[in-house]
C-alpha cells in the first residue's frame, strides 16, 4: 500500500500540527470523570441500566443474567472475597478462566474489593502457569474445573469457578464460590473499590510489549474508565440505533485485552446483550448468531477467514457490523468479506494491551469508506509518526513509528513479583508517550494505516508470542546449544513462529523430538496446516548467533537459499509449531 499522494503536499490539516508534529483526534474531546477517588466498578454501575434486560447469555446453555442479576452478583462476590478470604487493596488475584457468564462477575468483583486482577489463558501449560505464579505471587487463584487438574502446586488459596450460576459440583472449593455469593443481602448496598482511586492499579494484563519476554502491563482504574468512555461508549454514541438493542457475540477470549475491554467491561455499561461462547468454533458461532439474532461481531482475522471458508457460504442476515482488531488484515481477506457480506458494516480498529485497547476506530461514512485503514484517532488521544533514525516527527503521508499519548496509556510494566518496571519500560514509555513498535502513516483525511512492525513479537492469530519466551524453552533442552526464533508470514494466521536450532556436536536430536519437548513445555492446540509451515534447521559444524529481531527475516530468506546447496541440514520436512489458537 502506498501512502496518500495528496498528503505529501502537507496541506493545512485540522488534525495535524506542523509546528509540533502532533496528530490530534478529529473527534471533539470528551470529558472524563475528575474525581480522583473514583474506581472502575462504581463508574460502570453508574451507567448500567436498572431494567431486567438480558445482559449476558450463555450460548451453550441459554442461561442468562439480567442487569439486576449482574449488579447483585458482583456486589455479593466482592463482599464474600473480602470477608472470607480478606481480599482487599494490596491483594492480587489470578483469573485462570475461560469465557463464561462468571468471568465478568469475577473480574469486576475482584476490582470492587480494591484488589488487582491478572488474567491468563486457562489452556496454558503447567510450566507457564507456574512461571506466572512466580511473577505475580497472587493472593488468590480463581480457576475453572476444566483446568484445575493441571494446576501446579499453589501457595495461594484456590477457588473453583463455575461456567454459569446454575452449575452444581461436589468440590468444597467449588461450593465456596456459591457461599461467597450469599455473603450479603441483595438489597444491601456494598461499597465498591474500597480505598482505591483512578491512579491505582486495577489489572495486570500480560503482553510481549515491543521486545523481550512477556511482561505484565499495569493498567489503572483511570485507564479502564478511559477505555469505557473513549472506545466503547463513544463508538456507540456515533450510531442512531439504540445500543441496548444490539446483540454482541463474545467469540474472543476475555483473558485478552480485546475481549476483556468489550465483553467483561465496556459493553456492560451500555446494557446491550452479550452472547458468550466458551471458545470460537465456526458451527457454534453460526448457530449462536442465528439463534440470538446477533447484530455485532468483534473478531480477529482468523475468525473472519473461518467464516469465509464455510461451506456452503453463510447467510447471516442479522449481522449489522463486524469489527476486526488485534492483528493486521490483508487486502484479499477484506475484499472477500465485503463481497460475501455486502450488507454488513465492516470496520477495523487499533489498540494495544499497553493502551488498554484504545487507539483508533474505523467509521464508514458517505464520504469515506477506507476499509484497509484502522480508522481515526479516538477522542482525547494524540499521536506522532517518528522517523526511525532521526527521531523527528513526520507529516501525513510519511511512514514512521507510531507513538501514542492519552488517558488510556498504561501505568508501567511489571516483570517480576511486585510492581517493578522492566528494563525497557522507559524505552517503551518516553515522557508519557507509548512507542508502539508499529510502522504507520496518516493520510490526508486523518485515517491511520499500519504498514509494518519494528518489534520482534510474533502475531499469531491475534495473539502475541515473544520469541524470547520460545527461545527460553528451547535452550533448556540438554542437546540444544543455541536457538533463534523468528516468524514467517501466513495468509490465515498472519505470522507463524520459526525456530532455528543449533544441536550439540554429534547429537541425533530430531525435529520430532524437539516438537515433543516443546509440546510438554508450551500450551498447544490442534494441528494447523499451511503451505508456509515453520520448520527447524540445525547447524552442526558452525554456529550462527542472531537475535529474534529485524535480522531474523533476513536470515530466513538466506537460509532458504543456502539449504538448497547443502550448507544447512534440515532436520525434517516442514512441520508446525502448534501455538495458541482461538479456534
Swiss-Prot record:
Its EC number(s): 6.2.1.12
The keyword DNA repair appears for this protein: no
Coiled-coil intervals: none
First-tier enzyme category under EC: ligase
PROSITE patterns associated with the record: AMP_BINDING
Gene3D superfamilies: 3.30.300.30, N-terminal domain of ligase-like
Transmembrane segments: none
Residues annotated to bind (E)-4-coumaroyl-AMP: 258, 326, 348-349, 353, 455, 459
Keywords assigned: ATP-binding, Ligase, Magnesium, Nucleotide-binding
Residues that coordinate or bind CoA: 279, 461-462
Catalytic reaction(s) noted: (E)-4-coumarate + ATP + CoA = (E)-4-coumaroyl-CoA + AMP + diphosphate; (E)-4-coumarate + ATP + H(+) = (E)-4-coumaroyl-AMP + diphosphate; (E)-4-coumaroyl-AMP + CoA = (E)-4-coumaroyl-CoA + AMP + H(+)
Pfam families per the UniProt record, alphabetical: AMP-binding, AMP-binding_C
Amino-acid positions noted as binding ATP in the UniProt annotation, renumbered to this chain: 207-211, 215, 348-349, 353, 438, 453
Region spans: SBD1: 281-348
Region (SBD2): 349-419
Entry annotated with the keyword Transport: no
Cofactor requirement: Mg(2+)
Function: Carboxylate--CoA ligase that may use 4-coumarate as substrate. Follows a two-step reaction mechanism, wherein the carboxylate substrate first undergoes adenylation by ATP, followed by a thioesterification in the presence of CoA to yield the final CoA thioester.
Entry's family note: Belongs to the ATP-dependent AMP-binding enzyme family.
Free-text domain note: Both substrate-binding domains (SBD1 and SBD2) are involved in the substrate recognition, and are sufficient to confer the substrate specificity.
Protein name: 4-coumarate--CoA ligase-like 2
Annotated organism of origin: Oryza sativa subsp. japonica (Rice)
Organism ancestry: Eukaryota, Viridiplantae, Streptophyta, Embryophyta, Tracheophyta
Amino acid at each position: 500500500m502506498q501512502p496518500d499522494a495528496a498528503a505529501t503536499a502537507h496541506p493545512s490539516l485540522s488534525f495535524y500540527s506542523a509546528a509540533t508534529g502532533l496528530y490530534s483526534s478529529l473527534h471533539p474531546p470528551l470529558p472524563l470523570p475528575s474525581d480522583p477517588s473514583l474506581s472502575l466498578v462504581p463508574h460502570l454501575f453508574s451507567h448500567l441500566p436498572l431494567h431486567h434486560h438480558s445482559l449476558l447469555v450463555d450460548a451453550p446453555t441459554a442461561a442468562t443474567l439480567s442487569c439486576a442479576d449482574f449488579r447483585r452478583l458482583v456486589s455479593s462476590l466482592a463482599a464474600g472475597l473480602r470477608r472470607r478470604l480478606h481480599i482487599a487493596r494490596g491483594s492480587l488475584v489470578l483469573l485462570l478462566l475461560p469465557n463464561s457468564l462468571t468471568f465478568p462477575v469475577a473480574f469486576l468483583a475482584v476490582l470492587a474489593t480494591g484488589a488487582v486482577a491478572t488474567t491468563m489463558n486457562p489452556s496454558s501449560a503447567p510450566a507457564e502457569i507456574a512461571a506466572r505464579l512466580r511473577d505475580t505471587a497472587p493472593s488468590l487463584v480463581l480457576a475453572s474445573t476444566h483446568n484445575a487438574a493441571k494446576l501446579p502446586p499453589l501457595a495461594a488459596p484456590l477457588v473453583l469457578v463455575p461456567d454459569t450460576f446454575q452449575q452444581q459440583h461436589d468440590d468444597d472449593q467449588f461450593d465456596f464460590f456459591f457461599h461467597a455469593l450469599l455473603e450479603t443481602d441483595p438489597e444491601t448496598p456494598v461499597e465498591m473499590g474500597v480505598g482505591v482511586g483512578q491512579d491505582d492499579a486495577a489489572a495486570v494484563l500480560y503482553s510481549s510489549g515491543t521486545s523481550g519476554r512477556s511482561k505484565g502491563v499495569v493498567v489503572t482504574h483511570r485507564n479502564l474508565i478511559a477505555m469505557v468512555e473513549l472506545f466503547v461508549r463513544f463508538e456507540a454514541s456515533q450510531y442512531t440505533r439504540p445500543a441496548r438493542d444490539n446483540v454482541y457475540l463474545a467469540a474472543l477470549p476475555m483473558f485478552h485485552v480485546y475481549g476483556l475491554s468489550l465483553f467483561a467491561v465496556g459493553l456492560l455499561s451500555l446494557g446491550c446483550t452479550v452472547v458468550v461462547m466458551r471458545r470460537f468454533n465456526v458451527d457454534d458461532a453460526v448457530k449462536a448468531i442465528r439463534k440470538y439474532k446477533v447484530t455485532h461481531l468483534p473478531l480477529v482475522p482468523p475468525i473472519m477467514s473461518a467464516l469465509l471458508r464455510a461451506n456452503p457460504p453463510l447467510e447471516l442476515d442479522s449481522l449489522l457490523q463486524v469489527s476486526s482488531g488485534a492483528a493486521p488484515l490483508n487486502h484479499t481477506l477484506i475484499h472477500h468479506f465485503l463481497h460475501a457480506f455486502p450488507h454488513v458494516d465492516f470496520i477495523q480498529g487499533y489498540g494495544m494491551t499497553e493502551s488498554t485497547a484504545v487507539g483508533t476506530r474505523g467509521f464508514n461514512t458517505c464520504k469515506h469508506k477506507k476499509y484497509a485503514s484502522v480508522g481515526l484517532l479516538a477522542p482525547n488521544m494524540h499521536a506522532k509518526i517518528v522517523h526511525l533514525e532521526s527521531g523527528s516527527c513526520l507529516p501525513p503521508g510519511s511512514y514512521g513509528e507510531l507513538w501514542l499519548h492519552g488517558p488510556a496509556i498504561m501505568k508501567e510494566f511489571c516483570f517480576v513479583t511486585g510492581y517493578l518496571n522492566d528494563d525497557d519500560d522507559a524505552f517503551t514509555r518516553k515522557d508519557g508517550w507509548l512507542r508502539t513498535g508499529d510502522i504507520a502513516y496518516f493520510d490526508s483525511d486523518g485515517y491511520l494505516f499500519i504498514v509494518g512492525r519494528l518489534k520482534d513479537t510474533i502475531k499469531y492469530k491475534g495473539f502475541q508470542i515473544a520469541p524470547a519466551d520460545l527461545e527460553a524453552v528451547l535452550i533448556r533442552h540438554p542437546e540444544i546449544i543455541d536457538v533463534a526464533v523468528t516468524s514467517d508470514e501466513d495468509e490465515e494466521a498472519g505470522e507463524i513462529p520459526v525456530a532455528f536450532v543449533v544441536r550439540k556436536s554429534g547429537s541425533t536430536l530430531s525435529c520430532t523430538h524437539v516438537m515433543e519437548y516443546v509440546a510438554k513445555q508450551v500450551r498447544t492446540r490442534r494441528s494447523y496446516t499451511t503451505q508456509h509451515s515453520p520448520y527447524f534447521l540445525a547447524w552442526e559444524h558452525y554456529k550462527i548467533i542472531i537475535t529474534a529481531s529485524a535480522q531474523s527475516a533476513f536470515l530466513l530468506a538466506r537460509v532458504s537459499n543456502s539449504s538448497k546447496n547443502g550448507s544447512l541440514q534440515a532436520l525434517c520436512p516442514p512441520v508446525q509449531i502448534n501455538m495458541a489458537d482461538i479456534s
